[in-house]
Design a protein with these regions (language model features):
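OB-fold and OB-like single-stranded nucleic-acid-recognition modules
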Residues: 1-141
Length: 141
């Protein structure tokens, strides 16, 4: 299933962990990346976290909140997302908000007390393999 802008055809995909090296070498990393989905925003589907070999979980935001991914039924699925990778500092308030979106416990949310410098992806388009028909979307609320 596709979400957001169309992914350019014949685009070579990169593993998530390759983004850091691309940023270091070229100053930025724009392209098609692939990874396995760990979780998605339970509120509206405006972000997902993905994993890749030899790298911590990284967050993928949907560019300008222009589209959303399913809130459930996508964990463990392979995804391709087209967009930009960059490093950014997430404020304490934003981290807490994201934890709330993920359904974290109050103890987990309260434990956040310092900004976090992280690798972030901003996706213009997303493809998720094998999304079941009727997967809950934000519009299903």
């Amino acid at each position: 299933s596709y979400f957001g802008e169309a992914i350019p055809p014949n685009e070579e995909s990169f593993q998530v962990h390759e983004a850091a090296a691309m940023i270091e070498q070229f100053g930025s990393a724009t392209g098609l990346f692939e990874a396995e989905i760990v979780q998605s925003c339970k509120t509206i589907g405006c972000w997902m976290t993905v994993k890749g070999p030899h790298v911590d979980t990284v967050r993928v935001f949907m560019k300008d909140h222009a589209f959303f991914v399913p809130k459930d039924s996508i964990q463990g699925k392979k995804t391709y997302f087209y967009g930009e990778a960059f490093y950014d500092t997430l404020s304490v308030n934003l981290q807490k908000h994201l934890l709330e979106d993920a359904g974290a416990t109050l103890m987990e949310i309260d434990a956040v007390n310092v900004p976090a410098h992280q690798l972030i992806f901003e996706a213009a388009g997303v493809m998720i393999a094998d999304v079941p028909e009727g997967a809950p979307m934000a519009s299903d609320k």
